[in-house]
């Protein structure tokens, strides 16, 4: 009876998730960053690899075109991996009329990383200027890994979320797009289980709350070593009134104590969704975007697909 109940609950959870919205054209992506250009509404999608892949489309559904790389020569940061940049996060600042892209230079599986930033007037290939490191790195062996940057403005003040594995996700105030404020980073989320698999923070505001989304679980190599069911990537959410700390999930559990309400997990042919973000679509409203493996196409990183779903809201919590 107990096993039957668990199976029923698992099937109910799987059936609760909507399939990704349509995508046409070049639909490959990995750790996507997504932004809709202010001037004409054109979408630009950024992805891990090389000098950060750029694709663009007239709408979120496509047709997507592969445009090239944001930084074709890699980063000016003198660090291993500066020709293979990770986890782009893009935002626009009205006061400078520029787009800013944070990226990570890192060594896979090690706490050996640097976060850098580039800027552009248009987001087009050929328009990006690399500014190098923002001063956030692991040279002093901190409790965090400096990858997966995510910019957020909280009550008018800019901040950066970042972190992967180790002691989890941290937040630090920014002085400007290129410099940290002189305040130490503080932890906002942590996963005590499965080798502390938590990363890819993305924070956004809705109503009176700030919502912190993150990916939890094993984030790749599924074609080589498939993890146990439920240990692959999935997307979770906590919320906070202040946006800087005290994030809790729907049950009230702290995000610093392995909390996190599941927003999206494997279902049907959708496997291991993660690397997520939220975009404000001019027509659709708030949209969750992410990468996932389509079981009908393959489980390798080169097979990953771009996924998106409109957010629904019930009692102050998002769902898809």
UniProtKB/Swiss-Prot annotation:
It catalyses: Endohydrolysis of (1->5)-alpha-arabinofuranosidic linkages in (1->5)-arabinans. InterPro entries: GH43_arabinanases, Glyco_hydro_43, Glyco_hydro_43_endo_a_Ara-ase, Glyco_hydro_beta-prop_sf. The keyword Flavoprotein does not apply. It comes from the Eukaryota. Keywords: Carbohydrate metabolism, Glycoprotein, Glycosidase, Hydrolase, Polysaccharide degradation, Secreted, Signal, Xylan degradation. Its main location: secreted. The keyword Signal applies. GO terms for cellular component: extracellular region. GO terms for biological process: arabinan catabolic process; xylan catabolic process. CDD domains: GH43_AnAbnA-like. Its EC number is 3.2.1.99. Pfam families: Glyco_hydro_43. It is an enzyme of class 3 (hydrolase). Residues 1-16 form the signal peptide. The record marks 148 as: Important for catalytic activity, responsible for pKa modulation of the active site Glu and correct orientation of both the proton donor and substrate. Pathway: Glycan metabolism; L-arabinan degradation. Glycans are attached at residues 73, 137, 191. GO terms for molecular function: arabinan endo-1,5-alpha-L-arabinosidase activity. It is found in: Secreted. Belongs to the glycosyl hydrolase 43 family. Endo-1,5-alpha-L-arabinanase involved in degradation of pectin. Its preferred substrate is linear 1,5-alpha-L-arabinan. This is Probable arabinan endo-1,5-alpha-L-arabinosidase C. It comes from Aspergillus terreus (strain NIH 2624 / FGSC A1156). The gene is abnC.
């Amino acid at each position: 009876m107990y096993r039957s109940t668990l199976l029923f609950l698992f099937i109910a959870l799987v059936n609760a998730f909507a399939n990704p919205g349509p995508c046409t054209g070049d639909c490959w992506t990995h750790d996507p960053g997504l932004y809709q250009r202010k001037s004409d509404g054109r979408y630009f999608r950024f992805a891990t690899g090389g000098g950060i892949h750029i694709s663009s489309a007239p709408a979120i559904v496509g047709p997507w075109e592969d445009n090239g790389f944001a930084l074709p020569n890699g980063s000016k940061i003198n660090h291993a991996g500066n020709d293979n940049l990770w986890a782009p996060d893009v935002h626009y600042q009205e006061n400078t009329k520029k787009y800013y892209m944070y990226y990570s230079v890192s060594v896979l599986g090690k706490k050996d990383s640097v976060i850098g930033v580039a800027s552009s007037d248009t987001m087009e290939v050929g328009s990006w200027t690399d500014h190098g490191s923002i001063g956030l790195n692991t040279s002093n062996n901190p409790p965090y890994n400096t990858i997966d940057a995510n910019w957020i403005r909280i009550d008018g003040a800019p901040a950066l979320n970042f972190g992967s594995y180790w002691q989890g996700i941290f937040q630090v105030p920014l002085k400007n797009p290129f410099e940290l404020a002189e305040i130490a980073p503080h932890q906002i989320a942590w996963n005590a289980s499965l080798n502390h698999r938590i990363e890819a923070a993305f924070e956004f505001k809705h109503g009176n709350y700030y919502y912190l989304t993150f990916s939890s679980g094993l984030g790749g190599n599924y074609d080589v070593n498939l993890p146990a069911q439920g240990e692959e990537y999935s997307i979770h959410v906590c919320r906070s009134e202040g946006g800087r700390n005290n994030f809790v999930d729907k049950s009230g559990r702290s995000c610093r104590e392995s909390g996190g309400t599941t927003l999206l997990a494997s279902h049907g042919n959708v496997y291991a969704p993660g690397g997520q973000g939220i975009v404000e679509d001019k027509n659709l409203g708030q949209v969750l975007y992410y990468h996932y493996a389509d079981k009908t196409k393959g489980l390798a990183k080169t097979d990953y697909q771009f996924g998106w779903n409109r957010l629904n809201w019930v009692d102050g919590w998002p769902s898809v």
